């Protein structure tokens, strides 16, 4: 093997290693951007809830349980209508999304509890009005029964608005650790550092092939296409598999919300993969154009 051939061989080996590292860094960058732009983006969840009428389903479930409770106690089912509105349901759920995202970004120490005082006061007002309109005497037994009824109604509202006690969960060591890691991944310096590393690696490939400029676009293109294919195949294969349609959650509206959120994750991941693939193809097209011109000239000379 001649000296020139050996140099070319070493260049290809070094370029391959740098190209592989570039692919890995691009993969980490795309995952970080996905985490920041999709998982820690409140609009991802609010958009799904609005699009698929999850707020209405929560609202309907609350009143369905309240109506059942009232009927089982021989009370007209619409007696407590108005204790909570659809706007309040969406407001509370959205606030919980904002609080949770803020906690995961390490912007808050914990996730606050739901303020039930508004519903307690409103429920008490509705019950007092009902007693007054029906001229009912409030003895000790009735008072105890009403207190028990109020407690059950408030539990129904709270359990549908807060399926998981995020306030208690946010105080656990495990969740605190997850929040800290999440905040690091989401931080600007991490993303800027990865992008800077991408630029450095592209610069190194350009330096290796400074005399053969077309070749550098090929190696850079390989990195982007490899990364894009990995991201695309993970997202697309998950999306078409439909595994998210079999989420084992007993609460129908929660299962539906989780299904569409996972579907949204996979769709966004697929789109990211397509964008990276497109960038890779753009780099490769420069190399392909060079090859086309080169071999076109060869064929012309031969003819």
Where are these regions (language model features)?
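Short, Lys/Arg-enriched N-terminal segments with co-localized hydrophobic residues
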Residues: 1-5
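Cytosolic/nucleoplasmic, non-transmembrane interface domains of endomembrane
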Residues: 16, 20-181, 196
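Membrane-helix interface motif
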Residues: 34-38, 237-250
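Buried hydrophobic packing residues in well-ordered domains
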Residues: 58, 204-208, 265
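Short, membrane-exposed interhelical loops at transmembrane-helix boundaries
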Residues: 249-266
């Amino acid at each position: 093997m001649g000296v020139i051939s050996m140099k070319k061989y070493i260049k290809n080996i070094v370029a391959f290693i740098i190209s592989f590292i570039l692919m890995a860094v691009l993969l980490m960058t795309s995952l970080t951007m996905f985490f920041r732009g999709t998982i820690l983006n409140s609009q991802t969840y609010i958009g799904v809830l609005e699009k698929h009428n999850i707020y209405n389903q929560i609202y309907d479930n609350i009143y369905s349980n309240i109506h059942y409770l009232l009927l089982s106690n021989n009370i007209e089912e619409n007696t407590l209508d108005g204790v909570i509105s659809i706007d309040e349901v969406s407001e509370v759920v959205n606030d919980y999304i904002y609080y949770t995202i803020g906690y995961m970004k390490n912007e808050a120490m914990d996730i606050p509890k739901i303020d039930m005082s508004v519903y307690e006061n409103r429920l008490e007002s509705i019950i007092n009005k009902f007693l007054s309109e029906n001229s009912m005497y409030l003895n000790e037994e009735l008072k105890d029964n009403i207190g028990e009824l109020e407690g059950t109604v408030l539990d129904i509202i709270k359990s549908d608005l807060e399926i998981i006690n995020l306030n208690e969960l946010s105080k656990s060591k495990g969740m605190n650790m997850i929040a800290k890691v999440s905040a690091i991944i989401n931080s600007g310096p991490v993303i800027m550092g990865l992008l800077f590393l991408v630029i450095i690696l592209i610069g190194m490939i350009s330096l290796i092939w400074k005399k053969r400029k077309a070749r550098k676009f090929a190696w850079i293109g390989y990195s982007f296409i490899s990364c894009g294919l990995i991201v695309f195949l993970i997202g697309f294969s998950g999306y078409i598999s439909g595994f998210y349609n079999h989420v084992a959650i007993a609460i129908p509206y929660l299962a539906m919300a989780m299904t569409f959120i996972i579907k949204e994750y996979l769709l966004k991941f697929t789109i990211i993969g397509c964008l990276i693939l497109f960038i890779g193809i753009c780099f490769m097209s420069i190399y392909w154009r060079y090859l086309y011109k080169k071999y076109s000239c060869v064929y012309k000379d031969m003819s």
